[in-house]
């Protein structure tokens, strides 16, 4: 439908969860097409859509810096796509490790409730082994920062407009 009235800028991304996803443009309006699964939508919003909205608004958006965590699981994955695995951060002796939520399906809302964050597995990795380190993004820090920055941006940019409109 978008191709008939506008242009598809991209569709299909080499990520999991988060497929299918598309970005199009109709006249001067961007159209973001999201998958129907809740985990996919939540992660896409936090990691891709939110920064894109900031970019369109001319604001800077900085993703929180990940920390390195060793994984406490073995797993095979397809290469040529990045995967975000929901994990629980646990203390193991003197270090923290990442335990994978058992079911990683993109419809598993419980995986978000159980998890503390996500581990990002790069495209080139096909085997994940216990003890390997990967980038870990903490949900609490990440989502707090996303919503704090959004609210701060809205207050700075909308509050003067609202105040000035009431004076008229």
Language-model region placement:
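Helix-centric, low-specificity signal for extended rod-like, repetitive segments
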Residues: 12, 159-160
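Hydrophobic alpha-helical signal peptides and transmembrane signal-/tail-anchor segments
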Residues: 143-159
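Flexible glycine/proline-rich
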Residues: 1-142
